[in-house]
Amino acid sequence: MLKLNLQFFASKKGVSSTKNGRDSESKRLGAKRADGQYVTGGSILYRQRGTKIYPGENVGRGGDDTLFAKIDGVVRFERKGRDKKQVSVYAVAE
Protein backbone atom coordinates (compact mmCIF):
# COMPACT_ATOMS: atom_id res chain seq x y z
CA MET A 1 0.00 0.00 0.00
CA LEU A 2 1.28 3.43 -0.99
CA LYS A 3 1.14 6.22 1.61
CA LEU A 4 1.22 9.82 0.46
CA ASN A 5 2.09 12.61 2.86
CA LEU A 6 0.34 15.66 1.37
CA GLN A 7 0.62 19.02 3.15
CA PHE A 8 -1.32 22.07 1.98
CA PHE A 9 -0.04 25.55 2.82
CA ALA A 10 -2.05 28.74 2.93
CA SER A 11 -2.06 30.47 -0.44
CA LYS A 12 -3.20 33.75 1.15
CA LYS A 13 -1.43 35.44 4.01
CA GLY A 14 -3.61 35.96 7.08
CA VAL A 15 -4.76 39.61 7.06
CA SER A 16 -5.20 41.41 10.36
CA SER A 17 -7.03 44.68 10.78
CA THR A 18 -5.55 47.71 12.50
CA LYS A 19 -7.23 50.05 14.96
CA ASN A 20 -5.17 53.05 13.80
CA GLY A 21 -5.34 55.09 10.63
CA ARG A 22 -7.80 57.88 11.43
CA ASP A 23 -7.49 61.43 12.69
CA SER A 24 -9.81 64.41 13.01
CA GLU A 25 -9.46 67.36 10.67
CA SER A 26 -7.57 70.32 12.16
CA LYS A 27 -9.73 73.28 13.21
CA ARG A 28 -7.28 76.02 12.14
CA LEU A 29 -7.45 77.90 15.42
CA GLY A 30 -5.19 80.77 16.49
CA ALA A 31 -4.26 84.30 15.42
CA LYS A 32 -5.39 85.36 11.95
CA ARG A 33 -4.01 88.92 12.14
CA ALA A 34 -0.75 90.16 13.68
CA ASP A 35 -0.13 92.99 16.14
CA GLY A 36 0.09 96.34 14.32
CA GLN A 37 -1.65 95.04 11.20
CA TYR A 38 -4.38 97.14 9.54
CA VAL A 39 -7.79 95.42 9.35
CA THR A 40 -11.24 96.25 8.02
CA GLY A 41 -14.45 95.90 10.01
CA GLY A 42 -15.67 92.30 10.18
CA SER A 43 -12.19 90.78 9.81
CA ILE A 44 -11.51 87.71 11.94
CA LEU A 45 -8.66 88.43 14.36
CA TYR A 46 -8.45 85.26 16.47
CA ARG A 47 -10.16 81.85 16.29
CA GLN A 48 -10.38 80.01 19.61
CA ARG A 49 -12.31 77.58 21.78
CA GLY A 50 -13.25 79.30 25.02
CA THR A 51 -11.86 82.71 25.95
CA LYS A 52 -8.09 82.32 25.75
CA ILE A 53 -7.98 85.94 24.57
CA TYR A 54 -10.69 88.44 25.53
CA PRO A 55 -12.27 91.07 23.25
CA GLY A 56 -11.03 94.60 23.89
CA GLU A 57 -11.94 97.94 22.34
CA ASN A 58 -13.84 97.72 19.01
CA VAL A 59 -13.65 93.91 19.00
CA GLY A 60 -16.66 91.57 19.06
CA ARG A 61 -16.98 87.95 20.10
CA GLY A 62 -18.85 85.44 17.94
CA GLY A 63 -20.91 82.46 19.06
CA ASP A 64 -17.89 80.14 18.75
CA ASP A 65 -15.68 82.64 20.70
CA THR A 66 -14.09 83.97 17.49
CA LEU A 67 -12.83 87.54 17.89
CA PHE A 68 -13.55 89.98 15.03
CA ALA A 69 -12.96 93.67 14.30
CA LYS A 70 -15.96 96.01 14.59
CA ILE A 71 -14.24 98.94 12.84
CA ASP A 72 -11.40 99.59 10.40
CA GLY A 73 -8.14 100.13 12.24
CA VAL A 74 -4.91 98.72 13.66
CA VAL A 75 -4.80 95.52 15.74
CA ARG A 76 -3.19 95.57 19.20
CA PHE A 77 -2.67 92.51 21.40
CA GLU A 78 -2.52 93.71 25.04
CA ARG A 79 -2.36 92.41 28.60
CA LYS A 80 -5.50 92.61 30.71
CA GLY A 81 -4.36 92.42 34.32
CA ARG A 82 -1.76 89.88 35.38
CA ASP A 83 -2.86 86.73 33.62
CA LYS A 84 -5.29 87.70 30.86
CA LYS A 85 -4.81 88.90 27.30
CA GLN A 86 -7.06 90.95 25.07
CA VAL A 87 -7.09 92.16 21.50
CA SER A 88 -8.26 95.65 20.52
CA VAL A 89 -8.67 97.57 17.27
CA TYR A 90 -7.86 101.29 17.25
CA ALA A 91 -8.95 103.69 14.51
CA VAL A 92 -6.17 105.31 12.51
CA ALA A 93 -6.13 109.13 12.23
CA GLU A 94 -5.86 110.07 8.56
Swiss-Prot record:
GO terms for molecular function: structural constituent of ribosome. GO terms for biological process: translation. InterPro entries: Ribosomal_bL27, Ribosomal_bL27_CS. The keyword S-adenosyl-L-methionine does not apply. GO terms for cellular component: cytosolic large ribosomal subunit. Pfam families: Ribosomal_L27 (PF01016). Signal peptide: none annotated. Keywords: Ribonucleoprotein, Ribosomal protein. It comes from the Bacteria. The N-terminus is cleaved by ribosomal processing cysteine protease Prp. Residues 1-9 form a propeptide. SUPFAM superfamilies: Ribosomal L27 protein-like. Belongs to the bacterial ribosomal protein bL27 family. NCBIfam families: L27 (TIGR00062). PANTHER family: LARGE RIBOSOMAL SUBUNIT PROTEIN BL27M (PTHR15893:SF0), RIBOSOMAL PROTEIN L27 (PTHR15893). This is Large ribosomal subunit protein bL27. The lineage of its organism: Bacteria, Bacillati, Bacillota, Bacilli, Bacillales. The gene is rpmA.
